[in-house]
A protein has these predicted regions:
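N-terminal, active-site-proximal structural segment of metallo-dependent hydrolase catalytic domains
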Residues: 2-6, 18-81, 93-97
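Sec-dependent signal peptide hydrophobic core
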Residues: 5-13
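Active-site-proximal beta-strand elements of phosphoester/diester hydrolases
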Residues: 22-34, 113, 128-142
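Catalytic metal-binding/acid-base residues of hydrolase active sites
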Residues: 31, 63, 142, 172-173
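Structured beta-strand-rich core segments of catalytic domains in phosphoester-bond hydrolases
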Residues: 37-38, 62-134
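Active-site neighborhood of phospho(di)ester-bond hydrolases with catalytic His/Asp-centered motifs
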Residues: 58-60, 87-90, 167-171
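Active-site-proximal segments of metal-dependent phosphoesterases and phosphodiesterases across multiple
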Residues: 137-155
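Metal-dependent phosphoesterases centered on the DNase I-like endonuclease/exonuclease/phosphatase
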Residues: 150-173
Length: 173
């Protein structure tokens, strides 16, 4: 019930009246760029992204300069391999670096902000990136329904003065 309410509120926020336009959106939980074969493979992830030809991508579970991924900034690798522009938000410090979410976009954002989100099991974040014709939000929501509900007014407040179409994508758990 609470999850349905959360999703309903997000639906209303995302589909406010707007001018018709097409934006190809991909949401991809990349699991630290580790495949089912337990190997880090940034090219494999980049190929999946490129094959879908998105305008914008919400990425979850990105390592940035951690021991686990041998000091590589995963989003930076994906930027190089896809030719897209990256925006990163650390959610938690992790193994000498950080772990978080990101956006890959064809356009460079005009501006962006990072909003902390509730997360009992680990801290969560929301990236709000403004582009010429729209605003894009990327997130990786908490596993707990209570935290998901607590996130709704934070998202609503952060977007209350936006006068462009708003799109939101991510791992909503």
């Amino acid at each position: 019930m609470k999850r349905n309410l959360f999703l309903s509120v997000l639906f209303v926020l995302m589909f406010a009246p707007a001018h018709a336009q097409q934006v190809n959106i991909l949401s991809y939980n990349v699991h630290n760029c580790i495949g089912m074969d337990k190997e880090y493979n940034y090219r494999r992830i980049a190929n999946v992204i490129s094959q879908t030809s998105p305008d914008i991508v919400a990425l979850q579970e990105l390592d940035s300069v951690t021991v686990r991924n041998k000091g590589i900034h995963a989003l930076g690798e994906l930027e190089k391999l896809t030719g897209m522009h990256g925006t990163y938000a650390a959610a938690i410090p992790f193994q000498g670096g950080s772990y978080g979410i990101g956006i890959l976009s064809r356009e460079i954002p005009i501006k962006y902000k990072i909003i902390p989100m509730p997360g009992r099991e680990e801290k969560r974040t929301l990236i709000i990136a403004e582009f010429k014709d729209y605003v894009f939000c990327a997130t990786h929501q908490s596993l707990t329904p209570e935290d998901q509900l607590l996130a709704v007014p934070l998202i609503e407040k952060a977007l209350q003065n936006v006068d462009k179409p708003i799109f939101m994508a991510g791992d909503m758990n």
